[in-house]
Design a protein with these regions (language model features):
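Positively charged, low-complexity intrinsically disordered leader regions
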Residues: 1-6, 281-288
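Catalytic-core segments of class I nucleotidyltransferases/pyrophosphorylases
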Residues: 128, 142, 146-150, 178-285
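Well-ordered alpha-helical segments embedded in enzymatic catalytic cores
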Residues: 36-39, 111-115, 236
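N-terminal glycine-rich phosphate-binding loop and ensuing alpha1 helix
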Residues: 2-79, 84, 103, 140-143
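Intrinsic disorder at enzyme termini
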Residues: 283-299
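Conserved beta-loop-beta/alpha segment of the NTase-like Rossmann-fold superfamily
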Residues: 63-65, 73-76, 83, 87-177, ...
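Residues at the starts of beta-strands that form the adenosine-phosphate
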Residues: 5, 50-52, 126, 154-155, ...
Length: 299
């Protein structure tokens, strides 16, 4: 079966963005005027997903509200002739059907993925997992991953090729050398978490996109919890590899924005704003003036 269900883990506290995230989930912080989770949902929908399962904590249900219609607001905007604004608030509900899976305790990414199993239909044999802290641009890597799964079966992971001196910040793939699979597609032999540059088996590191065969749920039930009782998705994938399940990776050669800390988020916000036809020209001029030493409202 083709991809039908996409999963977005969104149960985290967003502590790096406090105090804002006391009341606003990090996933709803906007890049220009669009929350990151809507951008991720658009990527999933473009890859063919019809359902978005948002894994969230019991006190963080407001994320799902972004994907629900608000008839009163819609009527008000129609009455006032604000068609552009109306189109913006209809975009998320029209993208994809969203629902919630509750993660009662934050016990790792593997645990978050495991919470989704009750949401699936019997014939859901694959899910996409998209981490909302990672924006992979331009869209398209999920479609390529789906093609690889159609050809080879099993699970498919997204990888980035980084400079060797940076590998110690990531999980690094150990891969088979098989040129017959084509450029940027490799079978995974294993994974090493945050190795030193000298010990890393490659410079291919895990990115925030996974296309997982349903067998991953059984694997998650059989792995040993780590520190704090957490279940790591990488451990479940490693078990699949060990037991002979096909696991491949696709190297993403496009751009990536990490949104997990304020500095990275600001870089992404500037990038998106400069690309925005409405706001980009003015912002570019403003930034150039700052660089030229023409002053700031803050000094």
């Amino acid at each position: 079966m083709s991809l039908r269900t996409a999963v977005v883990p969104a149960a985290g506290l967003g502590t790096r963005f406090l105090p804002t995230t006391k009341s606003v989930p990090k996933e709803l912080l906007p890049l220009v005027a669009t929350p990151a989770i809507e951008i991720v949902a658009a990527e999933a929908a473009e890859a063919g997903a019809q359902r978005l399962v948002i894994v969230t904590s019991p006190g963080k249900r407001s994320v799902i509200e972004h994907f629900r219609r608000q008839p009163d607001l819609e009527d008000t905007l129609r009455e006032r002739g604000k068609d552009a604004e109306l189109a913006k608030i209809l975009r998320a509900p029209d993208l994809i059907t969203a629902e919630v899976a509750i993660q009662e305790r934050a016990l790792g990414l593997g645990h978050a993925v495991g919470c989704v199993e009750p949401n699936l239909d019997e014939d859901d044999d694959v899910i996409a997992v998209l981490l909302p802290d990672d924006l992979m641009l331009p869209f398209g890597v999920l479609e390529r991953m789906a093609q690889v799964r159609a050809e080879h079966g099993g699970s498919v992971l997204c990888a980035l090729d980084v400079p060797r001196e940076e590998v110690s910040a990531y999980g690094v793939f150990d891969t088979e050398d098989d040129t017959a699979m084509g450029a940027d597609v490799m079978r995974v032999r294993g994974m090493v978490e945050k190795p030193s540059p000298d010990e890393a088996p490659s410079t291919l590191v895990a990115a925030g996109r996974y296309l997982l065969d349903r067998a991953v749920f059984d694997a998650l039930k059989r792995i040993t919890p780590g520190a704090g009782g957490e279940l790591q998705l990488t451990d479940a994938v490693a078990l699949l590899v060990e037991e002979g399940h096909p696991v491949h990776l696709v190297v993403h050669r496009g751009g990536r924005h990490e949104l997990g800390n304020p500095a990275a988020f600001l870089r992404a916000a500037v990038d998106f704003a400069l690309s925005d036809p409405e706001h980009g020209p003015d912002l570019r001029e403003y930034l150039q003036n700052l660089l030229d030493g023409k002053g700031s409202a803050l000094r």
